[in-house]
Curated annotation (Swiss-Prot):
This is D-ribose pyranase. Homodecamer. It catalyses: beta-D-ribopyranose = beta-D-ribofuranose. Substrate binds at residues 28, 99, 123-125. The gene is rbsD. Catalyzes the interconversion of beta-pyran and beta-furan forms of D-ribose. GO terms for molecular function: D-ribose pyranase activity; intramolecular lyase activity; monosaccharide binding. Belongs to the RbsD / FucU family. RbsD subfamily.
Length: 134
């Protein structure tokens, strides 16, 4: 059995395919993610699993250099923004973009996976940009 934190085979596979600058997204239950082979739907019910638990687990196995968040999270969900910042290392760039731009980035060929959680708080979506480990 796998010893590392991520047990979901689809998430583990997506992380293992990442190269420098590739993207992986973690989304709330309401984000309109494409229904394609990159969709990893974890949502069981409202708030299960929650966004922050999935993010924390993914970060144990993924080296990141930048994150993208919706500009709207600053006012609509400041508590979630604070929780995200606690998990992100100081050397990781945080870029705020319009929520509409985030929706378009989900379709990027650089995006290797769209993880849907059961999160039901507004703008609980993040795009993780991969870094190298050397």
């Amino acid at each position: 059995m796998k010893k590392t934190a991520v047990l979901n085979s689809h998430i583990s596979s997506a992380i293992s395919t990442l190269g420098h600058y590739d993207l992986l997204t973690i989304n709330d239950a309401g984000m309109p993610i494409p229904n394609d082979d990159k969709r990893i739907d974890l949502a069981v019910t409202k708030s299960l699993p929650c966004f922050i638990d999935v993010l924390e687990t993914v970060l144990t196995e993924m080296e990141i250099q930048k994150i993208y968040l919706a500009e709207e999270i600053k006012t609509a969900n400041a508590q979630q923004l604070k929780a995200i910042k606690k998990l992100i290392n100081d050397d990781v760039e945080i870029k705020f973009i319009a929520h509409s731009e985030m929706k378009e980035m989900l379709k990027s060929p650089l995006n290797k996976g769209n993880i849907r959680t059961g999160e039901i708080t507004p703008f609980s979506n993040i795009i993780l940009e991969s870094n190298v480990t050397f």
